[in-house]
Design a protein with these regions (language model features):
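Short, conserved micro-motifs composed of acidic
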Residues: 27-294
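Bacterial N-terminal signal peptides that target proteins for export
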Residues: 1-9
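N-terminal Sec signal peptide cleavage junction
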Residues: 19-23
Length: 294
């Protein structure tokens, strides 16, 4: 089951590029004044392994991340903020990790914690879970109701919850015998007891999702007007942002986050939304970086 997680999807997509069936370059607007700049590496004191899929809690106190997606046992970890570029490692998050894969953390302002796990995919064809985070431990873990279609071969391998907890931005991928056929970002809203898929997702995401690229790792601003995500372009993942004028309108044409160079994925905003964190491959190690805007 680990073969259908993000690292495998990207590895296969890169292979397809090499044999001539790869991803299509999408046109993007030029950078604008006020875009993100000044990439800087983040330090996690007391931790020297891979750090991927960063998420900064809405109050700015904690950094959640997972170790390498290619690890035999990928687990969720947490660290406490010292400053914008320095966090103190606290260990694995309690109550959540299993022998399966756990990763891709996000959390709303009320401490409802979301993550991806393969623990029950063979039985449920579902991967997005939620629980309550408190002082380094997650309790009350359950499948996020209403998100999955529970269809074998369809995989939700990324998600981020909005700050208010009312909207889930998630990724859905259809798998065939040769691997992923697509990966698109969809939307679901919370109705008080379950999520309901937004019937307008295709319209809202029309300029974000593409037919030949993979779009994944969504991150939404508190206003709902900025959507950050990763797109696999040719053989490399690239960070993008798409904007809109109101929270019910479609997103416009995405722009590259040009300051985030190299093999980069998994953007996430700081609480003040002046910093964008992401992971980057440096040599054989994945580390966390930050870019900033005025």
């Amino acid at each position: 089951m680990r073969a259908i997680l993000r690292f495998a999807i990207l590895a296969l997509a890169c292979f397809l590029v090499a044999v001539g069936g790869g991803c299509e370059q999408a046109a993007t607007p030029e950078p604008k004044l006020g875009d993100f700049a000044n990439p800087q590496r983040v330090t996690i004191l007391g931790y020297n392994d891979h750090a991927m899929e960063p998420f900064v809690s809405r109050d700015g106190k904690y950094l959640f991340f997972n170790n390498s997606n290619e690890a035999v046992d990928t687990n969720l970890h947490w660290a406490e903020r010292i400053d914008d570029l320095t966090f103190q490692y606290k260990g694995e998050i309690g109550g959540v990790n299993t022998a399966a894969l756990e990763g891709v953390a996000s959390m709303d302002r009320n401490g409802v914690f979301y993550f991806v796990s393969t623990r029950s995919y063979d039985e449920t064809s579902s991967t997005i879970y939620r629980g309550s985070f408190d002082n380094g431990t997650i309790t009350g873990i359950e499948l996020a109701p209403g998100v999955s279609t529970a269809t074998p071969g369809i995989v939700n391998f990324d998600a981020e919850i909005s700050p208010d907890g009312n909207t889930l931005y998630f990724v859905e991928s259809q798998f065939g015998s040769s691997g992923p056929q697509n990966a698109n970002i969809l939307i679901a809203t919370w109705n008080g007891s379950a999520f309901v898929r937004d019937s307008n997702s295709a319209t809202i995401m029309k300029q974000v999702n593409t037919s030949k690229n993979l779009e994944y790792a969504p991150a939404i601003s508190s206003s709902g007007l900025e959507l950050f995500f990763t797109r696999l372009v040719e053989s490399s993942p690239v960070l993008y942002v798409a904007t809109r004028t109101d929270a019910s309108s479609p997103f416009g044409a995405p722009r590259k986050i040009t300051a985030a160079t190299g093999f980069v994925e998994g953007p996430t905003l700081s609480p003040g939304e002046k910093s964008l964190y992401y992971h980057k491959r440096e040599g054989s190690l994945f580390v966390i970086y930050r870019v900033t805007r005025p």
